Curated annotation (Swiss-Prot):
Its EC number is 2.5.1.75. Catalyzes the transfer of a dimethylallyl group onto the adenine at position 37 in tRNAs that read codons beginning with uridine, leading to the formation of N6-(dimethylallyl)adenosine (i(6)A). The record marks T100, R123 as: Interaction with substrate tRNA. Disulfide bonds: none annotated. Belongs to the IPP transferase family. ATP binds at G9, P10, T11, A12, V13, G14, K15, T16. It holds the Pfam family IPPT. This is tRNA dimethylallyltransferase. It catalyses: adenosine(37) in tRNA + dimethylallyl diphosphate = N(6)-dimethylallyladenosine(37) in tRNA + diphosphate. GO terms for biological process: tRNA modification. It comes from Roseiflexus castenholzii (strain DSM 13941 / HLO8). Monomer.
Length: 306
């Protein structure tokens, strides 16, 4: 069994700092479990580890595709499992680090995913329908053809709704019937970092302000100038979509920043629903004075590291 340390938690809780510390101490490498960090040129809005941080600890599954390229959950699972196997084969400790619930669950629970190639024709038709009739119409249709999948997907997550309908239309089989679970070949410990909501929200707000100071607005502008449009999954994600009204003259910059803080709070509230399902969880308060020592002890006890 391959030893695998997962470090999970809501956005801005402190996963990066802890994972870097543990990776340096236990000769590890980090596999990102963040659906936004796979995109090149989207650095500030996705809170990627800095170049200096990535120079000290090898990172995987960051800067994998351009913002206009498709990147599926199945592809992530394939690449992440390959990276974990490679890290372990070289005698190092793999750390799976992030907050994207589907990515974490696919790897840690061993999801057997439908290998249905993208169908641009079907997807384009569904995207047109979403644009003309709203995401609610697509969600209502999904509830008809695949109520199990609909129950797992938030009504506002149009991208996942479209993918579920795309798989159904391409195969005639609901996506929920094409997924099973096979326990993965890992000896897993999951460290779940937590914070009281008011403390976490304050951290989120401070990070948004730091992102703005670091040039987030210019990053978004640069992506638009490169030709990446708002309807791309990358550009419609958290940290970027909030600026669309500003660039289209429908909102002030202050309103866009306020919306980004609000949306990030909402996202952080929803993330724990995924974390609760993960295997072998140890919960640690992210603001504990002895956090590093407690995390180190967990790694030593679990993986017999020294």
């Amino acid at each position: 069994m391959i030893p695998l340390l997962a470090i999970v938690g809501p956005t801005a809780v402190g996963k990066t700092a802890l994972s870097l510390h543990l990776a340096r101490l236990f000769d590890g490498e980090i596999v990102s479990a963040d659906s936004r960090q796979v995109y090149r040129w989207m650095d500030i809005g996705t809170a990627k580890p800095t170049p200096a941080e990535r120079a000290t600890v090898p990172h995987h599954l960051i800067d994998v595709v351009d913002p206009d390229e498709d990147f599926s959950l199945a592809l992530y699972q394939d690449m992440a499992t390959a990276a974990i196997a490679d890290i372990a084969a070289r005698g190092k400790l793999p750390l799976l680090v992030g907050g994207t619930g589907q990515y974490l669950a696919a790897v840690l629970q061993g999801w057997q995913l439908p290998r249905v190639a993208p169908r641009p024709d079907i997807r384009a038709a569904l995207e047109r329908q979403a644009s003309e009739q709203g995401g609610e119409a697509l969600y209502a249709r999904l509830k008809e053809v695949d109520p199990i999948a609909a129950a797992r997907i938030l009504p506002g997550n149009v991208r996942r709704i479209i993918r579920a309908l795309e798989v159904y239309e391409a195969t005639g089989i609901p996506i929920s019937e094409q997924r099973s679970v096979q326990p993965p070949p890992y000896r897993i410990t999951t460290i779940w970092l937590t914070l009281p909501a008011p403390v976490l929200y304050a951290r989120i707000d401070a990070r948004v302000e730091a992102m703005m100071a670091a040039g987030l607005l210019d990053e978004v502008r640069g992506l638009l100038e490169r030709g990446y449009h708002w309807n791309l999954p990358s550009m419609s994600g958290l940290g970027y979509r909030e600026f669309r009204p500003y660039f289209e003259g429908r909102a002030t910059l202050e309103e866009a920043v306020t919306r980004l803080k609000y949306d990030t709070h909402t996202f952080a509230r929803r993330q724990p629903a995924w974390f609760r399902r993960l295997p072998n969880i140890v919960t640690l308060p992210a603001d504990a004075p002895d956090l590093l020592q407690r995390a180190e002890a967990i790694v030593r006890q679990t993986f017999d590291s020294s």
